[in-house]
Amino acid sequence: MEPFRIHKGTAAVLMNDNIDTDQIIPKQYLKRIERTGFGKFLFDEWRYDNERHENPNFPLNSPDRKGASILITGNNFGCGSSREHAPWALADYGFRVIIAGGFADIFYMNCMKNGMLPIVMDKEMREKLVKTDAREQIEVDLENEVITTSTHRFHFTIEKMWKEKLLNGLDEISITMQYEQEIKEYERRVAAY
């Protein structure tokens, strides 16, 4: 996993509450286990009409918001099924940071396991961020737990364990590999059956 230290990007805004994993990536696209190729189906039922034309009223289809890598959204983002495809779709689309009023617990963990930074932020602060010009680069500094725009500076918090994993680009496998010597020593000591 790529280390996450400072991210600069533009933001897309979808301030709906209770966006569930089926809305993030509909079930008909979940027949694969690769982590890539899901971005084109992100928010599929909202982004496209029945003939697969882009819905011009959907925020991610706005020309100013294309290429955004920060998503600012409502409360309880990622609720519903615990499938990991939802974070895969967000990451494959290009999002690195998701700022919400809150997240479903499993979704929150799955974001970090996939190298995305989910940030919990109250509504007042999110509304200030939403007013940022669509073309303005927003800086998210994980090490100092700060989000900076041209007019505001916001602090956020993250559990130390998750922060260290993201800063160092560690997933479960790479963490396990840090204990390779101890594992080999244990296997040498313990009799095989």
UniProtKB/Swiss-Prot annotation:
Source organism of this protein record: Bacillus cereus (strain AH820)
Catalytic reaction equation(s): (2R,3S)-3-isopropylmalate = (2S)-2-isopropylmalate
Record-linked InterPro entries: 3-IsopropMal_deHydase_ssu, Aconitase/3IPM_dehydase_swvl, AconitaseA/IPMdHydase_ssu_swvl, IPMI_Swivel, LeuD
Coiled coil (residue ranges): none
EC number assigned by the record: 4.2.1.33
Gene behind this protein: leuD
Keyword terms of this UniProt record: Amino-acid biosynthesis, Branched-chain amino acid biosynthesis, Leucine biosynthesis, Lyase
GO biological process: L-leucine biosynthetic process
Subunit structure: Heterodimer of LeuC and LeuD.
Function: Catalyzes the isomerization between 2-isopropylmalate and 3-isopropylmalate, via the formation of 2-isopropylmaleate.
Gene3D superfamilies listed in its UniProt record: Aconitase, domain 4
Keyword rRNA-binding set for record: no
Protein name per the record: 3-isopropylmalate dehydratase small subunit
